[in-house]
Amino acid sequence: MRPLHKRKSLYYDCKVRNRAAIIFWEDKHMRKNLTEIVFILDRSGSMSGLERDTIGGFNSMIEQQKKAEGEALISTVLFDNVSEVLHDRVNVKDIRPMTDRDYTVRGCTALLDAIGGAIHHIGNVHKYARPEDVPEHTMFVITTDGMENASRRYNSEKVKQMIERQKAKYGWEFLFLGANIDAVETASQFGIGADRAVNYQCDSEGTALNYEVVSEAISSVRCSAPLSADWKKRIDEDYKKRGGCKHK
């Protein structure tokens, strides 16, 4: 196998843990029931103490999505100062539970490299696929508990250009959940609107709530229902009620 940095089409600076073959759909109408979901999850050192909550919340969300109607392809990118691809376009029904072997906190926060690399990869897959193979919906869920501080390949302006292009040309959805930062302001620097960004309480309860709400939002997109501006209402209310960020 060639060294990763010489291989084509994958995320930049990523270690690939579980890559699925691209699914080719025979029925040209099947794309109407197909959703591409990309999770970009922070596992930098500041997430220490929330590993179990993150793993449990993610697994619970995936189990809920397995029961939903339609097809879904899951990609999961874990990032610290580098990115690691845990799932690469894997059918949701084939996703195994995340474990503490998969999610181990460490390092800094190369958020922009994780976002930019994932958009580049998924965009290329769609670009070279037959029209009938391109998922009807594509949704990115980005979660971080700190400021960008380690990216080398992408800057905020480049990521903003990429996100705005995918939103305008292909209707991709991007959700941004942030702690210890002004999530709305940070998201705006990346081309993500205030109605798609939310501050969350980075403790056990807040992490669990994140995944509950995100699962509801994904289900809405999968059934082609408009994602309303109040998708984040429960997270907003929790953050305002409990005020700020405390690890438990």
Language-model regions, residue ranges each:
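Acidic, low-complexity intrinsically disordered regions
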Residues: 2-248
